[in-house]
């Protein structure tokens, strides 16, 4: 779908047959037939009134071809006449070389379009309706561009607009902005102030919408068909103010002027020799087919038409005056997206081709390896079958009578006639296997012998280390026993020390009058070991007194009877060595030590 609303364009094409103003392009084209073009005098510039619009390629963007006629390669200047001072919308539009009905209809369509957008937003929700109203006011005030308005409107309503919306706004929004500027100047206000005070003139909800909102929005779930005409019949009061308009895609056939492409800037001639006015450009990708449909029946006329079009197209390009046409082709961003998609598709195709080529190469290599393996096994099978055949033949010849003489000759002839390549006798294989087995057996025996020798050496090392450790432990035990004897002797000699802690004693055990302590705490703590000795010392016959002479140094024989009771220091040393709660006897320590 190409985005200029076709209804307005077709109405313009139908109504431009009747000249609406003296300076319309239709009169210029008709008058130029009888007289050469004459430069009209420019109207006086009124400082207080609106400034006449200068025709530049970007002055009009409403999609209507207002270029002056080109006769004999000389473009005539644009007409700048007006009927009078601009006192209304139609009179203000005369400075733009537009008929009054054309400008009023375009403005009415634009206002109804904006009103329909706001009503659609209000139908969704009041918040979205307020957003749409703000966007519409910002668009009319030129604070946002048409593209930004398009994007923000789609984001607010979450509905895609039809493709003709942007070209329609580009074509008709300048007319509305000029009208707003004229009214604001008349009221001595800025356009934004005037629009804020007279918002109802732009978004007039009392005027019915020209069409359903589905004509402005893309069908999300539908099949893309236009709404039925019964929905238009509901708005019958619309026909009282605005004439009915044909659908956007229906071709108008009322005008006698033939259709042609927008690139054709020269007016065509009818059979009577009169010029027809240039119709406004519609959907330009189909108008050229409509324009030249009657020429395809006559090839000569078609060639002449093509030559005239190319010649005048070049003249219009080089003549310095060319109107800007509404371009309905893709924008640069859309072209970039299309190229990006195309590049991505080509890359995917290249990747698929590369993967297919690799897969075919892998399959080819696998097929070659399979073929080689199959040939190898075929050769092996043939060799085995030949060996079996020769073996059976030899056995049959040996058992058959009269074959002993020729057996050696036949076998020799057979072995000599057999090719040397690829043939190995069975005896050779047997000898080779036997040699390999012998080598394996010898290697295993050597390995076992080496392992046995290593184990023997390890056992010897372990035995020597064990003997050394036992000797060391015995030496340590002996040294500990000797140290214990020395400590015992020292404790016996020093009777002034405490038997519990070794400090200077101040008290004596009342039971035996032998044990000495530094205090009652040490006596109570040592009582678990001393009470046995204390009881034995009371009887006066202790077995330890007989074993005293066995102590090294012979000190026990020279001591008195009351000192024959063993010292508790011996119990301490035995307790530290054996970790037991009862003290050991001196004879037990002597026996262990010696």
UniProtKB/Swiss-Prot annotation:
Segments for region (Nervy homology region 2 (NHR2)): 322-368
Gene3D superfamilies: 6.10.140.2220, 6.10.250.230, TAFH/NHR1 domain (1.20.120.1110)
Region (Disordered): 48-96, 220-257, 388-416, 538-594
Key words of the record: Coiled coil, Isopeptide bond, Metal-binding, Nucleus, Phosphoprotein, Repressor, Transcription, Transcription regulation, Ubl conjugation, Zinc, Zinc-finger
Domain TAFH, first and last residues per copy: 104-199
Effect of residue 342 to R: Reduces PRDM14 and OCT14 occupancy on target sites, no effect on interaction with PRDM14, predicted to impair homooligomerization
A GO cellular component annotation in the UniProt record: nucleus
Distribution of this protein across tissues and organs: Expressed in embryonic stem cells.
Principal subcellular localization: nucleus
InterPro entries to which the protein is assigned, alphabetical: CBFA2T1/2/3 (IPR013289), MTGR1 (IPR013291), NHR2 (IPR014896), TAFH/NHR1_dom_sf (IPR037249), TAFH_NHR1 (IPR003894), Znf_MYND (IPR002893)
Domain of life: Eukaryota
Entry binding sites for Zn(2+) 2: 509, 512, 530, 534
Biased amino acid composition, Basic and acidic residues: 227-242
Task performed by this protein: Transcriptional corepressor which facilitates transcriptional repression via its association with DNA-binding transcription factors and recruitment of other corepressors and histone-modifying enzymes. Via association with PRDM14 is involved in regulation of embryonic stem cell (ESC) pluripotency. Involved in primordial germ cell (PCG) formation. Stabilizes PRDM14 and OCT4 on chromatin in a homooligomerization-dependent mannerCan repress the expression of MMP7 in a ZBTB33-dependent manner.
Similarity-based family: Belongs to the CBFA2T family.
Disease with which this protein is associated in UniProt: Required for tumorigenesis in a AOM/DSS colitis-associated carcinoma model. May be involved in intestinal tumorigenesis.
Protein's name in the database: Protein CBFA2T2
Source organism: Mus musculus (Mouse)
Gene behind the chain: Cbfa2t2
């Amino acid at each position: 779908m190409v985005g200029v609303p076709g209804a307005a364009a077709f109405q313009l094409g139908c109504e431009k047959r009747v000249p609406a103003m003296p300076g319309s392009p239709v009169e210029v084209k008709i008058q130029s037939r009888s007289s050469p073009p004459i430069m009209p005098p420019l109207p006086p510039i009124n400082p207080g009134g609106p400034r006449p619009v200068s025709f530049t390629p970007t002055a009009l963007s409403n999609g209507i071809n207002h270029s002056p006629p080109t006769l004999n390669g000389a473009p005539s200047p644009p007409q700048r006449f007006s009927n009078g001072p601009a006192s209304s919308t139609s009179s203000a539009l005369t400075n733009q070389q537009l008929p009054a009905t054309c400008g009023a209809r375009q403005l009415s369509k634009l206002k109804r379009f904006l009103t329909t957008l706001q009503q659609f937003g209000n139908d969704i929700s009041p918040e979205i309706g307020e957003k749409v109203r703000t966007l519409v006011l910002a668009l009319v005030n030129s604070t946002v561009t048409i593209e930004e308005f398009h994007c923000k409107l789609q984001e607010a309503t979450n509905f895609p607009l039809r493709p003709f919306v942007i070209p329609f706004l580009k074509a008709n929004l300048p007319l509305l902005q000029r009208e707003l500027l004229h009214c604001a100047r008349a009221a001595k206000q800025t356009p934004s102030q005037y629009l804020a005070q007279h918002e109802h003139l732009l978004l007039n909800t009392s005027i019915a919408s020209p069409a359903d909102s589905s004509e402005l929005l893309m069908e999300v779930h539908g099949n893309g068909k236009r709404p039925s005409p019964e929905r238009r019949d509901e708005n019958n009061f619309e026909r009282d103010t605005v004439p009915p308009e044909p659908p956007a895609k229906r071709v108008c056939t009322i005008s006698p002027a033939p259709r042609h492409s927008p690139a054709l800037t020269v007016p065509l001639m009818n059979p009577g020799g009169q010029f027809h006015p240039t119709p406004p450009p519609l959907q330009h990708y189909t108008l050229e087919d409509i324009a030249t449909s009657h020429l395809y029946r006559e090839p000569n006329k078609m060639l002449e038409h093509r030559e005239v079009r190319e010649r005048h197209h070049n003249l219009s390009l080089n003549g310095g005056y060319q109107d800007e046409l509404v371009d309905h082709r893709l924008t640069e961003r859309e072209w970039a997206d299309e190229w990006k998609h195309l590049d991505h598709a080509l890359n995917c195709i290249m990747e698929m081709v590369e993967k297919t080529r690799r897969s075919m190469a892998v399959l080819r290599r696998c097929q070659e390896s399979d073929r080689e393996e199959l040939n190898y096994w075929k050769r092996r099978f043939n060799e085995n079958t030949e060996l079996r055949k020769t073996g059976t033949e030899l056995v049959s010849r040996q058992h058959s009578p009269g074959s002993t003489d020729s057996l050696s000759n036949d076998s020799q002839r057979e072995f000599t006639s057999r090719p040397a390549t690829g043939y190995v006798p069975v005896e050779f294989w047997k000898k080779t296997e036997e040699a390999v087995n012998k080598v394996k057996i010898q290697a295993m025996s050597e390995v076992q012998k080496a392992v046995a020798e290593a184990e023997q050496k390890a056992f010897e090392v372990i035995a020597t280390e064990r003997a050394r450790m036992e000797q060391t432990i015995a030496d340590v035990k002996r040294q500990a026993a000797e140290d214990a004897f020395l400590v015992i002797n020292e404790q016996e000699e020093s009777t002034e020390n405490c038997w519990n802690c070794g400090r200077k004693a101040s008290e004596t055990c009342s039971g035996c009058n032998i044990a000495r302590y530094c205090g009652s705490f040490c006596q109570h703590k040592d009582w678990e070991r001393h009470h046995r000795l204390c009881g034995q010392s009371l009887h006066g016959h202790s077995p330890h007194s007989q074993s005293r002479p066995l102590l090294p140094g012979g000190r026990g024989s020279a001591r008195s009877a009351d000192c024959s009771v063993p010292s508790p220091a011996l119990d301490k040393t035995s307790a530290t060595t054996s970790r037991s709660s009862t003290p050991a006897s001196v004879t037990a320590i002597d026996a262990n030590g010696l």
